[in-house]
Design a protein with these regions (language model features):
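Flexible coil/turn and secondary-structure edge motifs
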Residues: 2, 21-203
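Bacterial N-terminal signal peptides
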Residues: 6-19
């Protein structure tokens, strides 16, 4: 094969490979989803069980105060919700699958708190990062509404992300397992989730 033919062949090969390589390079290795469903201890625990989730970070989102403390958020005065940033591998688990997991771990009919925890800081919400997440979240909510599974309205908010403040007690369910189990059982979370979603709900 002549040198000219070799060069032409190599250029053709690179041209064929480049679009796929560029697409792979443009796709982020990890992505983030943010969910609120009451106490972030429980939400963190629930998503850590999902295959493809790499990290969960509990904190506060959706309020008006910059870098609020736990005590400020707990007062309900800042407008924040307890939320969890979920870092995941989209090659293993899709955003739609994370939404499916979210719905099975939230009371979608209670907009003033979740389970035994009351107040706007415990309100359920899906915080979206882009138009694709927004559409998928809205579609998932509409699917539940259209299913007529519940007589009451689905009140989970779908909001754009805002500043996120990490909480002071990450991995509480790991560092304080006995206290966490007593809290979760006493709050009636899993009992209510099974009432809403059957065996798929809760732990």
């Amino acid at each position: 094969m002549s040198r000219t033919i070799k060069i032409v062949t190599l250029f053709a090969l690179f041209a064929w490979l480049s679009p796929a390589s560029a697409a792979d390079a443009a796709k982020p290795a990890t992505q983030i989803a943010t969910f609120a469903a009451g106490c972030y201890w429980c939400v963190e625990s629930d998503f850590d069980r999902v295959k493809g989730v790499l990290e969960t970070t509990p904190g506060f989102m959706g309020g008006k105060t910059e870098k609020p403390t736990y005590e400020e958020v707990s007062s309900g005065a800042t407008g924040h919700a307890e939320a969890v940033n979920v870092t995941y591998d989209p090659a293993v688990v899709s955003y739609k699958e994370l939404l499916d997991a979210y719905w099975l771990n939230v009371d979608p009919l209670d907009g003033t708190g979740q389970f035994c925890d009351r107040g706007s800081q415990y309100r359920p919400a899906i915080f979206v990062y882009n138009d694709e997440q927004k559409k998928l979240a809205e579609d998932s909510k509409k699917a539940i509404e259209d299913s007529k599974k519940f007589k009451e309205p689905v009140v989970v908010e779908i909001n754009a992300v805002s500043a996120f403040t990490p909480a002071p007690d990450p991995d509480f369910y790991k560092t304080n397992p006995i206290r966490y189990k007593f809290y979760r059982a006493g709050c009636g979370r899993d009992a209510r989730l099974k009432q809403l979603w059957g065996d798929k709900g809760g732990h």
